[in-house]
């Protein structure tokens, strides 16, 4: 299994409606057939510790069966449409891929 973990830092000036639209956009990625599972979340209210980075706004965890499935996800029309529509909403994106 390959885990494609994406963390988004949204522009602070986005309205609540824009943030909700972004979240809905991330949820559309669940429709990509190449992936096994898509999870979306925000920083958890866990105990604050120096090793925890909760500065991001939205987390996206995409589970793919292998590297080929992750490559298919990258070029899927739903993913490309999401990036095109929302690329102006974030100030930073950080990705961690692991197997």
PLM ranges: what are they?
Residues 2-40:
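N-terminal first-folded block
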Residues 15, 28, 42, 46-47, ...:
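Residue-identity detector for threonine
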Residues 15-16, 49, 60, 82:
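Intrinsically disordered, low-complexity segments enriched in polar/charged residues with Gly/Pro
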Residues 1-2, 99:
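Absolute protein N-terminus
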Residues 39-44, 97-99:
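A general secondary-structure junction signal
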């Amino acid at each position: 299994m390959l885990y494609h973990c994406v963390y988004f830092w949204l522009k602070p000036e986005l309205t609540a409606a824009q943030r909700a639209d972004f979240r809905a956009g991330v949820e559309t990625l669940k429709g990509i057939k190449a992936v096994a599972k898509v999870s979306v979340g925000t920083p958890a209210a866990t105990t604050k510790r120096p090793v925890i980075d909760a500065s991001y706004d939205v987390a996206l965890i995409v589970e793919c069966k292998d590297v080929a499935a992750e490559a298919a996800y990258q070029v899927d029309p739903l993913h490309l449409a999401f990036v095109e529509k929302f690329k102006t909403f974030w100030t930073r994106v950080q990705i961690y891929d692991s197997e």
